[in-house]
């Protein structure tokens, strides 16, 4: 079964993999996430990147604080991302390609049983 058209909206997702890389072009460090969503009973993978350099992206700081992934020394433990579900907002760009516009930690009561993997 194939998904022919993924509708824009909010889906339940989990972090499948992550890595950190420094861009050769900009010199900035990025957290690259592979997020798997449950769309109509099928698993679909998306990529989402966050800049980790100071002052560049407050969104990832909020996510890491929500998953208790920041210690007293302000070091991030990205492994804690694996322990949570996320609300993944999918929209389409001008070229008609779906992408993640927003990623938020889902509270336990926000995750429906049929959305679990």
Model-derived features: positions:
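Short beta-rich binding modules
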Residues: 1-117
């Amino acid at each position: 079964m194939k998904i022919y058209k993924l509708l824009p909206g909010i889906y339940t997702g989990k972090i499948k993999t992550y890595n950190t890389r420094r861009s050769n072009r900009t010199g900035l460090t990025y957290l690259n996430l592979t997020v798997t969503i449950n769309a109509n009973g099928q698993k679909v993978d998306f990529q989402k990147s966050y800049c980790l350099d100071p002052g560049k992206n407050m969104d990832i700081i909020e996510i890491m604080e929500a998953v208790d992934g920041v210690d007293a020394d302000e070091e991030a433990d990205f492994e804690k991302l694996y322990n949570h579900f996320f609300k993944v907002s999918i929209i389409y760009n001008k070229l008609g390609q779906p992408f993640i516009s927003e990623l938020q930690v889902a509270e336990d009561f926000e995750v429906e049983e049929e959305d679990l993997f």
